[in-house]
């Protein structure tokens, strides 16, 4: 039976990685519980008490009442009273009973699994009173009591049916209740219980809903990529007629975007053929040619800039590494020769009024 109780405690502790159907912050709650209470290590060995020669009923009904203060969703302080049960032992030579009760104070640590379901653990202490009777047929009759303090460990799950009503399933463990020098034994107690609690101050008037603020303007970014072979002849930075046609179409798209506070960046790229310095200069010249043309179409000169990137950021990767002939290599590297245009701006979000 002791192994069963420990297994339940371990299972509940395993859940305790997450926990919370907690009341509102800074509110009070109260409740009661009822369950199965079992004493462990119940042998008598002190103060003249004798062990039973018959059945010992270690499992009994346990009950309690509790109240607490919820500090925040994860922490509460809880106090309560527990009746841990009366354990009778019956034999034809020795009989009697052991019972205990106590007042406890614990910190309750919770964590939410779902909106209405928490896992929690309670840690603290109990001030207990233990009473024992021991009757030996034809011999001594003893009756003593003892008081003391023991640690309390508990874990469980709690579900909120409504904001004000919650239930909990809990396993609680208390070490060393009693003193063998007084009541003849010093058992431990484990109690598996079901509890119900009422949370005070959970209901409130529905808040007045303020009008939703106007949506924040959206920052938009658009990217366009044009092949340099369409815009320019190889190794040249002067726009071809078909390149101008391509930029005319691009200008129409840019005009349709119409962002506020817009800015356009034109990035020129080359392939890897040639020196770094030459490719950097050529990419800058090509980007500037595109900028000049778009400015001539109507884009404000202060809103558009040219940046030469040289042979950086090739899109072909290593696909052309084994191409040896120059003409074939030029064709293979064509995707690297490109002009990218990036448009950034703020666009107001228009919302429809509610019906």
Swiss-Prot record:
Q: Does the keyword Zinc-finger apply?
A: no
**Spans of repeat sequence:** 210-211, 212-213, 214-215, 216-217
Q: Which Pfam families match?
A: OmpA, OmpA_membrane
GO CC annotations? cell outer membrane; pore complex
What CDD domains does the annotation carry?
OmpA_C-like
Localisation: Cell outer membrane
Q: Transmembrane ranges?
A: 27-37, 60-71, 75-83, 101-112, 117-125, 151-160, 165-172, 191-199
Function noted in UniProt: With TolR probably plays a role in maintaining the position of the peptidoglycan cell wall in the periplasm. Acts as a porin with low permeability that allows slow penetration of small solutes; an internal gate slows down solute passage.
The protein's name is Outer membrane protein A
């Amino acid at each position: 039976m002791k192994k069963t109780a420990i297994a339940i405690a371990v299972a509940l502790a395993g859940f305790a990685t997450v926990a919370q159907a907690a009341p509102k912050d800074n509110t009070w709650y109260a409740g009661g519980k009822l369950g199965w209470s079992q004493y462990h290590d119940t042998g008598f060995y002190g103060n003249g008490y004798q062990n039973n020669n018959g059945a010992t009923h270690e499992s009994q009904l346990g009950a309690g009442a509790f109240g607490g203060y919820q500090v925040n969703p994860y922490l509460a302080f809880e106090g309560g009273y527990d009746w841990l049960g009366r354990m009778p032992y019956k034999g034809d030579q020795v009989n009697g009973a052991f019972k205990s009760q106590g007042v406890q104070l614990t910190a309750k640590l919770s964590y939410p699994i779902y909106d209405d379901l928490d896992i929690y653990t309670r840690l603290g202490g109990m001030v207990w009173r233990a009473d024992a009777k021991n009757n030996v047929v034809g011999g001594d009759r003893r009756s003593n009591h003892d008081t003391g303090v023991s640690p309390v460990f508990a874990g469980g799950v709690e579900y909120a049916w409504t904001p004000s009503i919650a239930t909990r399933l809990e396993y609680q463990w208390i070490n060393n209740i009693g003193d063998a020098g007084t009541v003849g034994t010093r058992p431990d107690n484990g109690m598996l219980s079901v509890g119900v609690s009422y949370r005070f101050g959970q209901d409130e008037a529905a808040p007045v809903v303020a009008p939703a603020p106007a949506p924040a303007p959206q920052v938009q970014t658009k990217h366009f990529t044009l092949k340099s072979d369409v815009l320019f002849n190889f190794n040249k930075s002067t726009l071809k007629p078909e390149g101008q046609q391509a930029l005319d179409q691009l200008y129409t798209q840019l005009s349709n975007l119409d962002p506020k506070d817009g800015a356009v960046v034109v990035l020129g790229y080359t392939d890897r053929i040639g020196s770094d310095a030459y490719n950097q200069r050529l990419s800058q010249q090509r980007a500037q040619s595109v900028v000049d043309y778009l400015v001539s179409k109507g884009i404000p000169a202060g809103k558009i800039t040219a940046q030469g990137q040289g042979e950086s950021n090739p899109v072909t990767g290593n696909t052309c590494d084994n191409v040896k002939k120059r003409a074939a290599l030029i064709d293979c590297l064509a995707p690297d020769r490109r002009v990218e245009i990036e448009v950034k701006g703020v666009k107001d979000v228009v919302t429809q009024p509610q019906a």
